[in-house]
Amino acid sequence: MQRNSRALLGGQAAAQLGLLLLSGLSLAGLGALGLRQELAKALEPNQVAVAGNDWRGASFPVENFQAYTSPFGYRASPDGTYNQEFHKGLDMAAPEGSYIRNWWAGRVVEVSDNTACGTSIVIQSGEWQHIYCHMKGQIETSGGGRYLSDRTGGIQIWEGQLVPAGARIGRVGMTGRPTGPHLHWGLKYASRYVDPAMVLRAMFAQQSGSTISSRSQ
């Protein structure tokens, strides 16, 4: 398992050669807020590494998904403390306690429970980082290491651990600054935040094409 994960990470690092410049923005969210598109273009990263990535084995990040509740981009502050803020991820509503699955094989580089993100995990997959927020559980230490512990859910995830795509890494909770049970899912490519919805669309297109191709053979 460890050898396969390392090989996959190496392939993902090479995928940056296929960087594709996309002009699509979170227009639905921006339109709902009535914000100027030119302001969004100036501040919202719009480079997404889509070409060259093989996401046929990637996983949707939450079980019992109900709805997308807040898109990537500018929005009104959910708690009313700001007129607008930049939302660095995609919120996915699911019943509290629903399991969260790792999107893509990688290594856990950070576990935390002391920010607005609540109990959270950051996983590195080549040039990609995926961030999971508002999870159940807390961060504990043992033998000089740190890990996310959710005993009720049977989850124990250590910093430095290799995690395959689709593995259960936590559960939807209400830690941090949530307005209801949901997963906040953030994505970075080469240290820049990108719109997770764009990546999901590319992933679904690849997976649908793979299914059609296998049926035709």
PLM regions with names:
Residues L35-S120, S125-G126, Q138, A165, ...:
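Surface-exposed, glycine-biased beta-strand/turn segments
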Residues L183-S191:
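A short hydrophobic beta-strand segment most commonly corresponding to one strand
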Residues E127-W128, S191:
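Glycine-centered tight beta-turn/hairpin loop motif at sheet-sheet or coil-to-beta transitions
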Residues P95, R101-N102, V111, W128-G166:
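Short histidine-centered loop motifs in beta-beta connectors
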Residues M1-A51, R215-Q217:
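N-terminal secretion targeting segments of exported proteins
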